[in-house]
From Swiss-Prot:
Enzyme class: hydrolase
Membrane topology (UniProt): Lipid-anchor; GPI-anchor
Main localisation: membrane
Residues flagged as site, Transition state stabilizer: D553
GO cellular component: external side of plasma membrane
Known catalytic reactions: Endohydrolysis of (1->4)-alpha-D-glucosidic linkages in polysaccharides containing three or more (1->4)-alpha-linked D-glucose units
Protein source organism: Schizosaccharomyces pombe (strain 972 / ATCC 24843) (Fission yeast)
EC number(s) on file: 3.2.1.1
Residues that coordinate or bind Ca(2+): N143, E395
Name of the protein in question: Alpha-amylase 4
Family recorded in the similarity comment: Belongs to the glycosyl hydrolase 13 family.
Amino acid sequence: MKLSLKDLALSIILVLGVAPPVQALSAEEWKKQSVYNVMTDRFATSKVVPHCDVKAEKYCGGNWQGIVDHLDYIRDLGFTAISISPVVEQLEGPEYHGEAYHGHRPKNYYRLNPHFGNEEDLKELSDALHGKGMYLMVDVAINHTISEYFEDDYFKNTYFDKTHIDHKCKEHCSCHHDKFPRPVPHNGTKPDHKPWKHEEHCHHGKFPRPVPHNGTKPDHKPWKHEEHCSCHHDKFPRPVPHNGTKPDHKPWKHEEHCSCHHDKFPRPVPHNGTKPDHKPWKHEEHCHHGKFPRPIPHNGTKPDHKPWKHEEHCHHGRFPRPVPHNGTKPDHKPWKHEEHCSCHHDKFSRPVPHNGTKPDHKPWKHEEHCHHGKFLRPVPHNVTKPDHKPWKHEEHCHHGKFPRPVPHNGTKPDHKPWKHEEHCSCHEDHSVHERPSAKGALEDYIQTFVETFQIDGIRFDAMGDKYRKYWPDFCKAAGVFCMGDLKSSDSLKVCDWQNDLEGLSNFPVRESAVKAFLMNNPEGIVDLADKMTDMRGLCVNPLLLGNFVENKDLPRMASISSDPATLKNAIAFVLMGDGIPMMYNGQELAMRGEEVPYNRPAIWEKGFPKRNPYYKFTSTINRFRKAMIESKDGEAFLNMQSDISIVDKRILLLRRGKVITVLNNLGSYYIHFHYTVSAEEHKWMDVLSCKSVPVQDNRQVFMVRNGEPMILYPEESAYEMGLCPSPIQLTEDYNSEGSLSINVEEAQTSKAPEQNRGFTNVLAALLLSLLMIL
């Protein structure tokens, strides 16, 4: 018998158990997985690091080698896959809510984040996972890209040679490095269409002084310092109106535009020329003797030339709301309250631009000039858009604490892209997906990245709700299963998106789930059941949605409730509810954190305790789920949506095949709850406690003790699969917390393929191969 060298090599590979390259998991195979979400910087470190100060929002020292060193912690927890935070190089520096440890400020997609390791470290993590029969999903923050640069020579000495996308972005904002930005007006508003000079839009104090359009001056010359700056050096500026409004076109005098007296807040003086008699304004006509000013607009702008009434120019809150000129309204009618006042009663006002600048001369809509955070987001003039359509939210807003307005590229007279210093947010430019060159480069990148590091799945972090048609192409280029993070609680919207991207985070169900198990929410179970029913009726395949209650951007369950029953019911729902289970690192330890950054603590500071009751509880359910999937009933269990039943509004029954998950919001202090069913079908056992359900008069009585969840499975099958010890094995010192983790581990070991074969078996197989050759 002759055997080629190729056949010999294949024979030796098969004998020695060397696996071929990992094949991409299909969507159906991902349904079998239980995913542990890891924030790389906060999970584990391979070096000695100081205490992690989460409030500082800096890198704490977690890395890929640390994950490799603690894979057994994740595997023993029962998870079969991990999802790690973005891996690419980030912009450095503490701007925009601290350092980019979270991975949302990508600088260069073709370089790895040196804080986490190098190319070999990431490959080692991938290989280590696959060696344990586990899988790797990576977060990709594509929606945070703004770069317009593609340079072939930039990637020398990187892990592969491709054109790149690099953020060549400097800090734009203020004229000097203080806490508040200085927005740059549209270049097109200057008569000569040249860029604005520094002195035309900046002031070196703590607060900016905006410069009006140059075109409003009669002589079209630049504004002088004294024409737009404070009359004296106090903390707040005094704006100077347009010179052209004076009858004689001469400069304004100091007393005409400065505070009536030297207090802490200014009183702006309107144009003298607007009075019907053209005489100077009297003190009482433009000043108010309280602590806060109420500016008085021009009397002459009112159609009837009568004095303004108090309610027309004052607001009784702590901060004034200026009233724009009535004359700018097309109909010359008085401004309505909602047109010039704050959208809601907070500490900061939202100025309303002139209505006359809109192409249709209709009133501005709420969403066009307001933002519900503490800081305002100015809305540029609609007329500057090439198509004259309304600005969309993402075109002028920034979701951080400070605004960075980004004008539309098409508004420049020469139609060239805006330069960084002209508009300047360093990230959050959403137009990258519309540029064919960038789209192609990103698709090339993700394909090469997946192949290089043997990635099994991609998660689109902070996907946003724009460019819907872009994501399927990007996922197709990756060639692996994709999970999109579409942050919306709208069932209809999420299910509609699933027509294009089958994997999505189930935010609608999550919103109901975090409230469902709270003892003080008697309607919570009903609301959760209704939301699950909605998703079932609307979505193409709800079983491919990510099922979760925590992530790096949301409050942790232990901060919402400290009740152990609530926390365990939430864990049981994540792992046994419909969809792909996805648990955020630290939930298995009931870690706290109400908001960012406090919900991102360092896991290693807890010491990876496997005796933690929530760790053991999570491990028990995960191992049961895996054993169930690998059983003869696995296909039915995996592909069946839960039959939903509600008992007395407080108990939720989710039945999938022979498995009944019993969840509740009774709380730890509720002693017992009885639920009776017929014993004809099965004799049930709770695999979490390994206690059989008692039978009375051919009826089985389920008893919910202290609000803890149950997973019911036929008693005989539980014994056969080794999920629970048989009655012969039971002892009096049975641990009430359950000793399932040990027994299931033993059962799983007996079922799983042996990965470390003995030397004798290898030698025997090798001899057999040699005999075949001979």
